[in-house]
Amino acid sequence: FLDYLDANNFASSKIVLTKDGQAITSWHNKPIMIKEFLHGAISHDLSANLLTDLGAELAKLHTLSAPDYLPQTVSYGIERFDEVKVYAAESCFYAWLKETEVYIEKSMSSNLPKSLIHSDIFCDNIIISKDGKTATIMDFEEVSYYYRIFDIGMMIIGTCRSDGALSLEKAKYLLKGYQQNIKLQSNEVKALQAFTTYGAAAIAFWRHQNFNYVNIDTTMKDHYLTMKNLADDVMGISHAQFQRSLGIDILKL
């Protein structure tokens, strides 16, 4: 997939091919892939200019045709929330997750545009250049063909926080950059708050399942609470305030 991005002039990690032109080789009987080193650093406090540029990059990604081999769901999507029943059917978390699912599904529609999406753009998946002027999105392990508004909502959760709280001011710059290349449809504007909640709830689901069931780690068992609380915070904002703060008031479309 990284070759596909490179062929379409989307800046990301680049694969180093073997002498015989192969992308994958083996080391001690294990498949490996070597990528060019990206010089720079990770920042959890992105500037307004970088957020604007990243928004434009996300829109550029969404304009690429989605290869047929991509999955059409995300690996921690709403379709999998019921997996919590296997190990925590009576938990407060599962009850909360189902209530949140109802809230999200009210904004889901077959009319919402779908595209190639990254689905996991957090600050940890972005490399900032040494001069602080450019940002490169990497780690496309969760790429899929899904609602593009999910990608936007997830990126807001992943990159637009200040002291742990959602920053609508930062998100405004992200959307400003995005809409330089893609103008949000009115149904996407209406759904963005729910899909921002979806992004946080999806990560909360993954963390809860991973650290309490799949790869049990008692030191991380409550790690999901950060995202659960963030989802609650997003749902607690009035719809009108959410749109106005992001500069996407539906009345102005």
Predicted regions and their residues:
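ATP-binding pocket architecture of kinase catalytic cores
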Residues: F1-D68
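Active-site acidic catalytic loop and adjacent metal/ATP-binding pocket
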Residues: I15, V102-F150, L253
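A cross-family kinase active-site recognition segment
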Residues: H44-Y94, L112-K114
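Active-site activation/catalytic loop segments of kinase-like enzymes and analogous catalytic loops
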Residues: I149-K183, Y198-N215
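All-alpha amphipathic helical-bundle segments outside canonical DNA-binding/catalytic cores
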Residues: L184-T196
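ATP/Mg2+ or Mg2+-diphosphate-binding catalytic cores
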Residues: I203-L253
